[in-house]
Amino acid sequence: MEVERVQAIASLGQKLDTIPSEFIRSEHEQPGKTTFDGPIPEIPVIDLGDKDGIVGAVAEAAREWGLFQIINHGIPVEVIKELQRVGKEFFELPQEEKEVYAMDMVTMEGYGTKLQKETEGKKAWVDHLFHNIWPESRINYNFWPQNPPDYRKANKEYAKHLLEVMGEILTSLSLGLGLEGHVFKEALGGDAIELLLKINYYPTCPRPDLALGVPAHTDMSAITLLVPNEVPGLQVFKDDHWFDAKYIPNAIIVHIGDQIEILSNGKYKSVLHRTTVNKEKVRMSWPVFCSPPGEWMVGTLPQLVSEDTPAKYKTKKYKDYQYCKLNKLPQ
């Protein structure tokens, strides 16, 4: 069965001032009507070079926003640029070359268009590529593009650096709750934590006021570490408003995901966010979802539960949580 890719729809509609009806959001979702247009509060920017202030800053941002940007994170600029270059080149390949990597609906890896079950039958203005980048035992190179030829090298190099950043963030989140630094990482599987890369490709859209690249959602991961290209589009929901996230070159955007909210018993917030699209420029982003293995049991940490503060969340296998989330079933 042939699947219609958004990139193909966008190229056909370049001369039009309209988009297919299945991409037009209801009024309560349309970014043209729902984006806050007053003074925008500053999303926290945290300097990982400031070793004295990092724990307090990460914990406060995770409580108040569920999202923050990190600078001086130690990942060389050229490593990020290479990751972005090879990803962009993949999406510029002829369509039939990309379809070789079409999504496997069992593992959720590969090239595709539709992921989550959409309410109201609406579609998101995005194509994507998913594949695991860590641990080695979870990597299936059948989903790693062979073109461009240095795709594998660029992704492996990025993964190596990103593991260190992930460890630093998880340690800070643990310490920020008065726990020992290793607690969160161990509660998520330790060295078995899995890193899943997604490349989002948001083609130019003639009606960015009506469409969304990705509708409002929280990430099911523990944390998500994301680098975007220079085209803004990420929006965060806070205080009943949708706010634009400012683009900071070479910063990494950190999303607190559902598993950290569960472990922390709600002290840290999984951030509700969405993505807008652009009329003139292609937007791309490279989120990496850091998650426990599928069979791993995740629940509120016992250290954070007492008679006065009972656990707010069920303990369950991560794969069962995933299934419910993707199929919009109650947890």
Swiss-Prot record:
Pathway in which this enzyme or protein is active: Flavonoid metabolism
Metal-binding keyword on record: yes
Domain of life: Eukaryota
Major enzyme class: oxidoreductase
List of residues binding Fe cation: H217, D219, H273
Names of the cofactor(s): L-ascorbate; Fe(2+)
Pfam families: 2OG-FeII_Oxy, DIOX_N
Residues the entry annotates as binding 2-oxoglutarate: R283
Keyword Iron included in the entry's annotation: yes
Tissue: Expressed in young cromes.
Function: Catalyzes the formation of flavonols from dihydroflavonols. Can act on dihydrokaempferol to produce kaempferol, on dihydroquercetin to produce quercitin and on dihydromyricetin to produce myricetin.
Entry similarity comment: Belongs to the iron/ascorbate-dependent oxidoreductase family.
Protein name: Flavonol synthase 1
Organism listed in the record: Crocosmia x crocosmiiflora (Montbretia)
Gene: FLS1
